[in-house]
């Protein structure tokens, strides 16, 4: 499994050896335009793009883009997807916070990101993380939106990470019905994003 991005002085290849089937994440390699030599560029081993589950996405866009010889890309780590960059063989965060960056564009130092942040359906944000659209304000006005509280459970030597979404009117110490939802995907993660199905329950 491989994909590529055109850099100024080299072709950047994101490739996985398939050792763990579809669960194998990629590393970065570069192909020099002059010599055609392929060399390792950065060991990464994390997912490219977002795999944060959600049911309110509308379309999509690019998950990676070259600017000169710098790669900007979305990557899922643990329970969220943020924007990172690969420069001179090193990966560093650009804009990472709770939620999911779903797609973005970058030009002349400016960015526009489509993200699921702050328990809202997709909105557009600039390179500082400032929200620039208000597509969903009217839909959410006057509605209760449960905030996902992280929950970690340990069974033997294995830790399970999850969230609790408390119902409207929840009172500590008072019993209430519970819906227990386990995702079965090998790559999908639940994260702190607006998920209509879970809010509806």
Predicted regions and their residues:
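A flexible loop/linker signature enriched in serine peptidases of the S9 family
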Residues: 1, 13-29, 33, 40-59, ...
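Repeated scaffold domains used in trafficking and secretory/extracellular systems
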Residues: 2-4, 61-63, 100-106
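Residue-level detector of Asp-centered blade-edge/turn motifs that repeat once per structural unit
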Residues: 6-8, 66-68, 106-108
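Hydrophobic beta-strand positions that form the internal "hydrophobic ladder"
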Residues: 9-11, 71, 111-112
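Residue-level detector of beta-strand face positions
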Residues: 29, 84, 150-152
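Short loop/turn segments that connect beta-strands within beta-propeller blades
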Residues: 32-36, 86-90, 127-128
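Beta-propeller fold detector
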Residues: 38-45, 92-96, 129-137
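Serine-hydrolase catalytic core recognition
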Residues: 103-110, 114-201
């Amino acid at each position: 499994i491989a994909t590529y991005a055109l850099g100024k002085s080299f072709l950047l290849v994101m490739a996985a050896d398939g050792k763990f089937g579809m669960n194998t994440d990629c590393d970065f390699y570069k192909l020099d335009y002059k010599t055609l030599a392929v060399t390792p560029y950065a060991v990464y081993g994390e997912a490219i793009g977002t795999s944060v589950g959600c049911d309110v996405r509308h379309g999509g866009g690019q998950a990676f883009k070259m600017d000169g010889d710098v790669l900007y890309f979305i990557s899922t780590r643990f329970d969220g997807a943020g924007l990172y960059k690969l420069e001179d063989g090193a990966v560093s965060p650009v804009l990472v916070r709770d939620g999911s960056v779903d797609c973005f564009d970058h030009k002349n130092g400016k960015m526009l990101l489509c993200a699921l942040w702050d328990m809202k359906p997709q909105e557009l944000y600039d390179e500082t993380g400032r929200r620039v659209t208000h597509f969903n304000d009217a839909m959410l006005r006057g509605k209760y939106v449960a905030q996902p509280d992280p929950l970690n459970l340990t069974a033997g030597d294995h830790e399970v990470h999850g969230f609790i979404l408390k119902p409207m009117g929840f009172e500590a110490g008072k019993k209430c019905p519970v819906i227990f939802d386990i995702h079965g995907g090998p790559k999908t993660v639940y994260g702190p994003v607006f998920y209509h199905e879970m809010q509806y329950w």
